Amino acid sequence: MIVNDYLAKTYGPQPCWELVADVYQTERFAVPVDYKTVNRSIREMSSAFRLAIHKSAHGFVQIDAPVNFAIVLLGKSERVGIHHCGIYFDGRVLHALPGITVYEELSVIRDTFELVEFWAKA
């Protein structure tokens, strides 16, 4: 994966989920998500992706240690829950925020988010 290709991009209203879909579409395989692009909220988008990943219809399993191309699900706290995501690659997490895509060390991610889950294709 050429990380700089993704760092040069900006994504729409729900940038993190759109980045994950873009990376999987480009680098791996599409992750079909039953979600319409009209009136999407962060919670609805998160729900759709979590269902696509957690139901394992696409062969995803939760793993303890990250591997390249693992989807990283993130949450600020248990109360808030999972609401952000990225892609693990070479010790860092590629994730998108409104207006910018960043590639941060996993240690920085762990300092920022209380909840960190890794999901990989089985």
Each PLM stretch: what is its role?
Residues 1-2, 122:
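Short, low-complexity, intrinsically disordered N-terminal peptides in bacterial proteins
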Residues 3-11:
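A glycine-biased structural micro-motif
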Residues 10-27:
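Active-site nucleophilic cysteine motif
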Residues 13, 31-36:
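Surface-exposed patches in mature extracellular/periplasmic domains of secreted proteins
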Residues 36-102, 121-122:
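...with weaker cross-activation on analogous glycine-rich loops/strands in unrelated enzymes
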Residues 103-122:
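Short, Lys/Arg-rich amphipathic alpha-helical interaction segments
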